Amino acid sequence: MLVPKRVKFRRVHRGKLRGEAKGGKSVAFGDYGLQALDSHWISNRQIEAARVAITRYMKRGGKVWIKIFPHKSYTAKGVGVRMGNGKGTPDGWVAPVKRGKVMFEVGGVSEEVAREALRLAAMKLPVRTKVLSREEVGGESNED
């Protein structure tokens, strides 16, 4: 499970997820990527479920890159606790993902395998997604 080793502050503001992602909108490492079409918080459990779905489908072939990390804690008050008395205790970790961000990339497998693996991963995530290829986005080419 992805969690930060150390954080400066345990409790952080929720913030707003407005607009598009500033960077990470193209396929940089692999040949195919999974791009978010909505903005949403993605928990470390959802990231792990998507990673497992991709790696199980690809079996031993190919490589997976996870381009998001859950660095933001979210808090929750216990069940039956009255309002007030400060902010709740940290309950989990999330990665704030804005629209347009490429979350996962795969490489070293055929197009059919990559698209199906990313489709299975997309089912585990709370955002609408699109599968991109390096050629569609105009990413760097691997030809010398």
From Swiss-Prot:
GO terms for molecular function: rRNA binding; structural constituent of ribosome; tRNA binding. CDD domains: Ribosomal_L16_L10e (cd01433). Pfam families: Ribosomal_L16 (PF00252). The keyword Ribonucleoprotein applies. One of its GO terms (cellular component) is cytosolic large ribosomal subunit. Belongs to the universal ribosomal protein uL16 family. Part of the 50S ribosomal subunit. Binds 23S rRNA and is also seen to make contacts with the A and possibly P site tRNAs. This is Large ribosomal subunit protein uL16. It comes from Levilactobacillus brevis (strain ATCC 367 / BCRC 12310 / CIP 105137 / JCM 1170 / LMG 11437 / NCIMB 947 / NCTC 947) (Lactobacillus brevis). The lineage of its organism: Bacteria, Bacillati, Bacillota, Bacilli, Lactobacillales. The gene is rplP.
